[in-house]
Amino acid sequence: MNERADRSGGAAPGGDRTHRVPVLVVGGSLVGLSTSVFLGRLGVRHTLVERHAGTSIHPRGRGNNVRTMEIFRVAGTEPDIRRAAATLADNHGILQAPTLAGDAGEWLFKQIDPGGGLARFSPSSWCLCSQNDLEPELLTHATNLGGDLRFGTELLSFEADTEGVTAIVKSRETGEHTTIRADYLVAADGPRSPVREQLGIGQSGPGDLFHNVSITFRSRRLADVVGDRRFIVCYLTDENADGALLPVDNRENWVFHAPWHPEQGETVEDFTDERCAAHIRRAIGDPDLDVEITGKAPWHAAQRVARSYRSGRVLLAGDSAHEMSPTGAFGSNTGIQDAHNLAWKLAAVLEGWAGEALLDTYDTERRPVAEATSARAAHRSVEHSHPGFAPPPVAGGGGPGAGTPGGAGRGTGGPGGPGGPGGLGGPGGPGGTGGPGGPGGPGGPDGPRGAGGAPGGGPGGGPGGGGPQRGILNVALGYRYPRGAVVGADPATPVVPEGLDLTGAPGSRAPHLWVRRGQDRLSTLDLYEDSLVLLSDAAQPTGWHEAAAGVAAGMRVPLKSYRVGGSPGADLNPDDEETDWARAHGVTRGGAVLVRPDGFVAWRSPGPAPDPESMLRQVVGTVLARS
């Protein structure tokens, strides 16, 4: 089936010529389009090429986790994305049943954020927006920001040297060739990634995990069978017709994921419309159900991570850098967050306020996140049932995914719903990865704060649950960078901590506090996008604010300084008078916190410094790789 909406009008006109641009983005799916939006917000000229004629038209990859939505909030896209997702705004739970007809089923959980506890940590929340609805919104924003987006344009070849990359692209509509000379190339070209393969970058991980076929269909009577059960995904467990059912509009459009076993000689061609319709009827439990098949897309779940995210002037992002089990909807979210990490670093280097070595920290920071996240996703896949997934027994236990055959198959995508809210007894279903496949849902939040102060309770169980159950909020929001463009981080700190700890530690996502700037109410996270930011106390004459002005001018670095507190002269006033901004960031009122443009803490000083400008200059130089 044609899975892209035609937007080939963006292809370059004219004959052979050389086009010069700071950044060339290869791939125009979620990660490529997000990269374009983030670069556009930072004023970085770029060209994006995508071989397909337009954006995805297949409903898949629906799970956008809270960190992704925070990023989209700062980028100005969140309101439009939520409008595009309005149809499924009231769908929250994961249901499991032998069949839907005549069986109430068992709710694995009914709410993504029971009790609304997520608001303590974030101004945003999860959003179910399928890829076919999300990509057009990103495309519109990227275009409005001045992005040069060329759909229907294929990368034919590229050569990288020490000064940049020379690429040859071809309009698939006209056959015309264009030479593009870029300072950097971002490869968001999917799990098969010709760019990665040409560079000879290998991959680690067990490989393919399982295969499904995503079937889109229409059924007017199915809504009556479903009734008021507003699930994100329903796992149907009849041993002769298992599968995962997902609503597209809660009325007549649906997606069903059926197991596919190519290792047994089964082909995609075996999935005829008649076979698919019969399977769906058996799974639903209604032999007379009206089923009109409208599309089919094979996909696989895999666990692979590139051994390097950078080769000179070329950087990998999204599925070209990592594939992971669909459990928890980590794949596309991790890719979008790759793009966010990379965009500010490219801007800093291209604009001359950071050293070129800053780009090395992209691999240093993001690859361990993908490794830890993919391992956690595989762990949850062992815990949760999914059609076609049967992890082999591993002698001696092993780790998540150990013993899984590492095939060379390529495909993409993943279905599913959110991982369940930990600590509440509800395991979650799988969420989507980033390529063609089924829609994914968000991971559920951790359980209530335990006695020790960390969400999800004590160290005996994972966050958000005991024993093998692990919460997802610490994975989606609490991951950190023990090494990279940070100063003072503990290199022994796990990338994914056992609990959610957003208290201002270097390498972690900065805390969220509601503040007032004049008449405007905003989250502190809204401050972080196009510059470094220094927070200090408005009532303490420690010299941090003046030091920031001196460093910004002397080093020619975009560095904004905000004095926080209820005192006269404060730039930011906490919305709640009881809020202690310094304590929330792990410092005293005499200290300071430096936050990066991506909202991660670069460094903090617990208290005053004898020479704050000298200290800050040294820290900024280290963070930005300034020799």
From Swiss-Prot:
Cofactor: FAD
Binding site for FAD: 22-51, 309-319
Family affiliation: Belongs to the PheA/TfdB FAD monooxygenase family.
Enzyme nomenclature, EC number: 1.14.13.-
Keyword field: FAD, Flavoprotein, Oxidoreductase
Superkingdom, taxonomy of origin: Bacteria
InterPro entries: FAD-bd (IPR002938), FAD/NAD-bd_sf (IPR036188), RIFMO-like (IPR050641)
Alphabetized GO MF terms: FAD binding; oxidoreductase activity; oxidoreductase activity, acting on paired donors, with incorporation or reduction of molecular oxygen, NAD(P)H as one donor, and incorporation of one atom of oxygen
Role this protein plays: Involved in developmentally regulated synthesis of a compound biosynthetically related to polyketide antibiotics which is essential for spore color in Streptococcus coelicolor.
Residue ranges of the region described as Disordered: 370-469
Gly residues: compositionally biased ranges: 395-469
Protein name: Putative polyketide hydroxylase
